[in-house]
């Protein structure tokens, strides 16, 4: 049985945000697991309207971590982020011949938990390892071709 490592964390919640939960989840999936700085950069340039409230909540969680918990902002990572469904406001749109269609104005509750994770050790990165493997396979194929 493995135990999860507990990192110091802080959270923020935005409730009753006037954006559909499915649209918020599209944006949330872009930033899950990223550092707070990277997440805010991604959201700043994301074309979706839901990126603005999500960025606000991430910035709020980072500020909570810094002010309330005393954590270093450069080590913060978006550990958990999700959008739950809030109450739906229902409106009526009149249609032809006395009919009426229902408009559903959906809301969501956006929750973000940021954790302060230690910086990774300076080791071989995945791309460097991939480059070494490619070079080794290229050398092996050239060796086979010369024989």
Curated annotation (Swiss-Prot):
Originating species: Mycolicibacterium gilvum (strain PYR-GCK) (Mycobacterium gilvum (strain PYR-GCK))
For bias kind Low complexity, which ranges apply?
Answer: 136-147
What does the UniProt function comment say about this protein? This protein binds specifically to 23S rRNA; its binding is stimulated by other ribosomal proteins, e.g. L4, L17, and L20. It is important during the early stages of 50S assembly. It makes multiple contacts with different domains of the 23S rRNA in the assembled 50S subunit and ribosome.
Q: Name one GO molecular function term.
A: rRNA binding
GO BP of this protein: translation
**Entry's Pfam families?**
Ribosomal_L22
What name appears for this protein in its UniProt entry? Large ribosomal subunit protein uL22
Quaternary assembly = Part of the 50S ribosomal subunit.
* Database matches in SUPFAM superfamilies: Ribosomal protein L22
- InterPro entries assigned to the protein according to its UniProt record, in alphabetical order: Ribosomal_uL22, Ribosomal_uL22_bac/chlpt-type, Ribosomal_uL22_bac/org-type, Ribosomal_uL22_CS, Ribosomal_uL22_sf
Question: CDD domains attached here?
Answer: Ribosomal_L22
NCBIfam families in UniProt: rplV_bact
- Answer yes or no on keyword Disulfide bond: no
Its keywords, alphabetically, are: Ribonucleoprotein, Ribosomal protein, RNA-binding, rRNA-binding
Q: Which family does it belong to?
A: Belongs to the universal ribosomal protein uL22 family.
From the UniProt entry, list the residue stretches annotated as the region Disordered.
112-147
Under the cellular component aspect of Gene Ontology, which terms does the record hold? cytosolic large ribosomal subunit
| Entry keyword Transmembrane helix | no
Under the heading HAMAP family, the entry gives: Ribosomal_uL22_B (MF_01331_B)
